């Protein structure tokens, strides 16, 4: 199966910076790799990163070893019987009215003011803000439509930007009301360009 380029870049980074160096340090070759070796890797990683990060490592390892079985480099996938950590439930924290107003005061006039305000008020992701186009803002009907993203990643040692007209999830494609303060701020920004 195929994955998005940004996902591939993330997998490559995990493999080349974390996973492979760990096993190379222990001088463990692919054909010698055991379930216990992988389990020990997860335990070691849990001392420095979250369970969710280790779950991502597991996905990379499992997929790579599944491919190694497919091309007959190894006979069985040692990651198949590893107990991966349980996913941690995300508990978001939010600014209260005073905190958000303090933030807005601090960023007044900063080059990232518009981006930070869009993130804080509308909950836009970084890649949604970077991918925002003037055509997504309907000043007549006062709407803001999220339908384009730009994601940055490193692939083969090169920094690249990936533009996409598909969102992270179906619910990410959305149209929201453009409130008066943001309408005025965005119109002023557009006039300066």
Functional labels for PLM-detected ranges:
Residues 1-73, 89:
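N-terminal core-binding DNA-recognition domain of tyrosine site-specific recombinases/integrases
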Residues 81, 132-192:
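Conserved tyrosine-mediated DNA breakage-rejoining catalytic core shared by Y-recombinases
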Residues 19, 38, 61-64, 72, ...:
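Conserved hydrophobic/aromatic pocket- or pore-lining residues that grip, position, or stack substrates
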Residues 51, 55, 70, 74-75, ...:
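Basic, Lys/Arg- and aromatic-enriched nucleic-acid-binding interface segment
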Residues 10, 40, 56, 81, ...:
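Short, solvent-exposed alpha-helical surface patches in well-structured domains
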Residues 64-67, 71, 106, 185, ...:
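Generic, well-ordered alpha-helical scaffold segments in large soluble proteins
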Residues 31-34, 96, 179:
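GHKL-family ATP-binding catalytic core of two-component histidine kinases
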